[in-house]
């Protein structure tokens, strides 16, 4: 039994099903994160909700707990086809879908509910086989692949009781909204299904979509600044472009860091950094749009298991990565969009753990620092790296 603690909400307090509580206990979650405490208060009553939260706040578990509770409380329809999911989660990237499905599998472990995923870049027939083998309770998918299955008549969305749209702002940016509209038209009307929408930002466009797709939603906002700065110690090193690689190598090698994410702005830069680290004896891998899907999933598993110490990524690939235990994020180049900075450093210091971000500001990217400071609402001290961090990289014989 979890002891009551002032200012904290326990999962016990929501009277969840024992099979779900068993899984929550296994995962070691005694108390809700702020977004979980707020969102579940509304969604467990069946209300629609719009949540503004960055990744790392526990929003995935919030909507999954809500879905699982709804499905356990309501018996499945007597007549249903294999390809008729009862809950649908749409997310913009393959990595995010895989991560949500992994969390869903952990939370449904003792419930008898089935979780399935549809993502592009993976074998269509293999995904079809899982659909034909058993009933689908929770379907997690990217919009394009879901439409493929829907248009071929393999998936029917008329039984969807709960629909979740995750990273809605990102779906807008990536041009997925027309596909999402087509999908939503196949589901029951908005008053007949529960709809939850999550976004890192509440732009006018996002709010317009929310209005169209939800009924009288609860609006929950978790300030991104807290996510960005409270648990992450932020540093900036002023360093010449030609010294950046030396600094990166020495930071990782001298400190024996185990799980580090390095961000760069361009795919060719990501490739170059990864190749040099590997050549210099540090186990590294890259994540960018050029890396095929099966390799991405293998890479993420290797990173999660500690076989890969350094993961080098672009912003698009990096945003879908949600792995606990990343101790350091290094910005090899500062992003031009300040929001990307917040997303990058949000890979560490997740779910209350502490983390460190180190940014390299060189002659080519120091201009990006003031807008980042403006977004954070504070200055980040710019320091010179100590001499031992600029030592030449030892030659491998």
Swiss-Prot record:
Chain ranges of the Helicase C-terminal domain: 243-393
Positions with a binding annotation for ATP: 53-60
Gene3D superfamilies named among the record's database cross-references: P-loop containing nucleotide triphosphate hydrolases
Main location: cytoplasm
UniProt catalytic activity: ATP + H2O = ADP + phosphate + H(+)
The UniProt record lists the keyword RNA-binding: yes
Sequence motif: DEAD box, positions: 166-169
Motif Q motif boundaries: 9-37
Assigned GO CC terms: cytosol
Transmembrane segments: none
GO biological process, one term: RNA catabolic process
Assembly with partners or alone: Component of the RNA degradosome, which is a multiprotein complex involved in RNA processing and mRNA degradation.
HAMAP family: DEAD_helicase_RhlB
Family: Belongs to the DEAD box helicase family. RhlB subfamily.
The protein's name: ATP-dependent RNA helicase RhlB
Species of the source: Pseudomonas aeruginosa (strain ATCC 15692 / DSM 22644 / CIP 104116 / JCM 14847 / LMG 12228 / 1C / PRS 101 / PAO1)
